Amino acid sequence: LGVFATSSVLGPIIGGLFAGASQILWINGWRWVFLINLPIGIVALFMVVSFLHVPHTPKQHRIDWLGAVTIVIAVVPLLLVAENGRDWGWDSTESIAMYVTGGVGIILFILAERAAKHEALLPLSLFKSKTFSMATILGVIVGVGMFGGMMTLPLLLQIVMGATPTEAGFMMLPMVAGMMTATIVSGQITSRTGKYKMFMVIGPSLLALGYLYLTSFSADTQYWQASIGMILIGLGLGQLMQTLTLAAQNSVPASEVGVATASATFFRQMGGTLGVAVFISILFNNLADTIPAAFKRADVQAGLKAALKDPKVLSDPNNAEFLKGLQSGNMGALAGKLNTDSSFLNHLDPRLARPFLVGFADAGVTVFAIAGAVVAVAIVIAIFTKAPALRTKSAVQEAAAANAH
């Protein structure tokens, strides 16, 4: 799980490298965001086949085809609305149709899993364990707060601090360092003491503290100041990710460890998808308020007045669209470009670009505040979640012992 958590943060770094490259092996750089999974997947499959040798007793099983179909009906519409809701409108006909279809799919999936019983894709008996249920809820909440808030950071680094995608990726390294450190330390303590409940509470507490710290982010924030918040977030995630899965794994019978692990990961990823969709929507929708408010700030107005008296600024064609919008009193079109392409800010006179930077930073602060509040809920739930004792035997060993009797 520490590997997964670290990979979640390394992803934007590597993705930034690909996005910033014009071509790699004669293929557009951004396409490697998808293509990189092919060689990695092939290596992973080779290692599994070569090194993972688990004793297997053939048994007759029935594949839960109905569960597989209904979970697709449930999940795909929700993913579509999460991806397109900001463009469609969250209350549009298309979005409502996706909500309804997804809701019907969830009901059908539950009915299918009840009928499949122990052969179910997701055995509902797992939720009889209060710990598993609480760990699942925690996973969803943490996924929302983790991915939703974390995906905002690279945008702020690029738009407000002027970093390229590649630079923004490397600027996330403090979070990676915090995560790896916390993962190693908490993992060692857990393996030596068998106790991990404290990390279920400390983890989200540090995560919330990191978001709380980042609510002080502004257009004047220095990178070293932002990196403190990243380290706190990394320290929180490094402790939390693996312990949530440990709680889920140790709350179910040994024979169900695999499906419990997969389920915990699935629900966390769904929470992350929801978090990214909602928080990015909040970020860009907030710009309609924060950018006009930034134009009214005294320091911004002073800079604008000085720039408008500068002949070089007035004659620069890069400033023409801004000046036209300012003259008409409608900056909406230019502000709207931040949704798709913020590169125009790099060519504007810094005094003209400042209200956009201030407004974007203020919108990001709103996201961090909401993400922190979401994670605070996780802290409360974690306090009341029971942490089962760690197993002393693997599932294979337990099965062998049961067969011996």
Kindly label every feature range from the protein language model.
Residues 1-14, 20, 149, 155, ...:
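Small-residue-rich alpha-helical segments with characteristic i,i+4
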Residues 9, 13, 72, 180-181, ...:
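Hydrophobic/small/kink-forming positions within alpha-helical transmembrane segments
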Residues 16-29, 85-89, 159, 191-192, ...:
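Extracellular/lumenal inter-transmembrane loop segments of multi-pass membrane transporters
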Residues 38-39, 66, 80, 88-259, ...:
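Transmembrane core module of solute transporters
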